[in-house]
Amino acid sequence: GREHSFPPAFIQRVDELGAPHGITGQMVKLGGTKMDEPSRYRVIVDRISHEVEYYRGAMKHAVLQGGYVINNPFWWTADDKYFNYSVMAKLGVAIPRTVLLPQKGYPADIDLTGESLHNLVYPIDWDALLDYVGRPAILKPYSGGGWKHVYKVADKRELLEAYDRTAPYCMTLQQFINFDHYVRCFTFGKDDIMPVRYDPRERRYIVDHEYLSPEVGSRVVADARTINKALGYEMNTVEFAIRQGVPYAIDFLNPAPDFERDRITPFYFDMVVD
């Protein structure tokens, strides 16, 4: 990844724990990958290939050559938030009502004609979509993260104003959960779940171990496990907006979570490294 604090701390911890077993950690180095080249690494913790296409291809090749990559680069490539919402709703996780929207515009290098879009219904019945998800609503990309291109809209006018700024991204329109509590769970190995109080408005982690009731905390952990086992993620963050005791899974496609010490607090940084 591109962080400054996590990679060296993690490598140091691997070296400390792995020394009796002949295991060492190091930064992966890539400089042109030959198709018959064996993987030089037994296990790779991938935290950047979603942003660098060459890295993603190299991670897939590493798997082919016998390496183990966290997270699985094939599923990560195929995944998107809207599909995940639909899967989890079928598995009984509380999910806000969500609509997948046609794109406002398309990348300039794609040669589209009127015939390319003849399957689209026009005009879109925006009132019906808002009636389904409720008002206010959240407009956000159907894939990607980092709180980019996320809008809270109160009505049709605000929705259309925001939608007009979203090209070339495919977006979702989602029910807004006016939460009483909000948590972000660090998850590892699918089963190791660490719920953390989180302020999404300030994007700030808060050390508070009495934040959730035992009942809500247990459901948050159980739902996070369901999500990770269904999607196969071994490193992820899962966000829940909790309203009247019901945890709604808001965001859980984060296979390369931000682990920078100053942002997740020194307390949680040490736990994440371990």
Predicted regions and their residues:
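Conserved N-proximal alpha/beta basic substrate-recognition cap immediately N-terminal to
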Residues: 2-115
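Short, solvent-exposed loop/turn segments at secondary-structure junctions
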Residues: 2-3, 50-51, 76, 143-145, ...
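Active-site nucleotide/adenylate-binding loops and adjacent lid/helix of ATP-dependent enzymes
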Residues: 63-66, 74-182, 214-222
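Short glycine/proline- and charge-enriched loop/turn segments
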Residues: 66, 201-209, 252-258
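Conserved hydrophobic "DFG−1" position in protein kinase catalytic cores
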Residues: 152, 187, 240-242
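Beta-strand scaffold of nucleotide-dependent catalytic cores
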Residues: 161-163, 172-174, 182-199, 248-253
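A long amphipathic alpha-helix within ATP-dependent nucleotide-binding catalytic cores
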Residues: 203-247, 271
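C-terminal active-site "lid" helix and adjoining low-complexity regulatory extension at the edge
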Residues: 242-274
